[in-house]
Amino acid sequence: MENTQENPTDQTTEETGREAQAAENAAPAAEAALAEAQAKIAELQESFLRAKAETENVRRRAQDDVAKAHKFAIESFAENLLPVLDSLEAAVGDTSGDLAKVREGVELTLRQLTSALEKGRVAALNPVGEKFDPHLHQAISMVPADQEPNTVVAVLQKGYTIADRVLRPALVTVAQPK
C-alpha cells in the first residue's frame, strides 16, 4: 500500500521556501520604497529651508520698506517746511522798518506754515462751543457762562492732531454747571 499522506516536514519546508522567496522579492521593493521616502524627505527639507529663507527675506524687505516710508515721510514734511524757513529768514534780514510790510510777511509765513502742516495731516483743534472732550481738550478753568455745562467757552491754546491722533490737547475754559 502506498502512503498518500504528505509528510508534514515537507509541507513546512515548502512553506518556508515560499516565505523566503517572498521575502527576497519584497526586499528590493522595500528598499525602493525606503529610497523613495528618503528622497521625498530630502526634497521636503529643501523645500522647507527655501520657504523659511523666503519668509525671512520678505520680513526683512518689509522692515526696510517701513523704515524707508518713515524716512521719506519725514523728508516730505521737512521739504514742506523749507519755504516757511525761507520766509522767516527773509523777515529777519529785512531792515526796512516798515511794520505793515513786516506784518504782511508774517501773515504770509503763517499761511505757509499752516499749509505745510495740513500737508503733513496736522490739524488745529478750535473747540469753542463744543462739548468738552478730555481726549482732545485740557480744562484749565471753569467759568459761569450762558452755555450748557461742560461746553468749551474759550480756547487759551490751540490743540493739534495728526491723522486723528492728538499731538497736543487744546487748553480750554469750560462752562461750569449752573
Curated annotation (Swiss-Prot):
Gene Ontology biological process terms in this record: protein folding
Region described as Disordered: spans on this chain: 1-31
Annotated gene: grpE
Keyword terms: Chaperone, Cytoplasm, Stress response
Protein name: Protein GrpE
Naturally occurring in which organism (per UniProt): Burkholderia thailandensis (strain ATCC 700388 / DSM 13276 / CCUG 48851 / CIP 106301 / E264)
Task of the protein: Participates actively in the response to hyperosmotic and heat shock by preventing the aggregation of stress-denatured proteins, in association with DnaK and GrpE. It is the nucleotide exchange factor for DnaK and may function as a thermosensor. Unfolded proteins bind initially to DnaJ; upon interaction with the DnaJ-bound protein, DnaK hydrolyzes its bound ATP, resulting in the formation of a stable complex. GrpE releases ADP from DnaK; ATP binding to DnaK triggers the release of the substrate protein, thus completing the reaction cycle.
Compositional bias of kind Low complexity: 19-31
Superkingdom, natural source: Bacteria
Major localisation: cytoplasm
GO molecular function, one term: protein homodimerization activity
Polar residues biased stretches: 1-11
